Amino acid sequence: MPEPEGASGGQRAPFAYTTIRVVPRVEREEFVNVGVVLYSRPRKYLGVQARLDRERLRALWPDPDLDAVERQLDVIRLVVAGNPTGGAIALLPAAERFGWLSAPASTVVQPGPVHAGLADNPEAALHELFIELVELASSD
């Protein structure tokens, strides 16, 4: 679990996070992590980092509609930002938006399980998780 030092003088606050997965063939339960959504109520922070590794997805999914996947990731970004273009969910408070984004789904783009951690800087924790769970996984 990341425990970065930083902005708040070392006072860590709890956060919850979920990975964003692309599951090309739901019946096979194979997935590629493409992002992380992190929420910290005490820090009033909801953030997302996402990147689509098109080559890796093509290896699992011979005929992908990656533009549709990218559009779904764009909607997730809008919801996290609270941008009304993201739909009705984007207008909810941050805790409820995280709840919707982390709710189990049987779709091509879906969240992984929710995990918890402590960090004094949730933005730095999000970046560390993104590197560990998405970027490093892509380079395996």
Predicted features along the sequence, with ranges:
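Polybasic/polar functional segments that serve as interface/processing modules
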Residues: 1-140
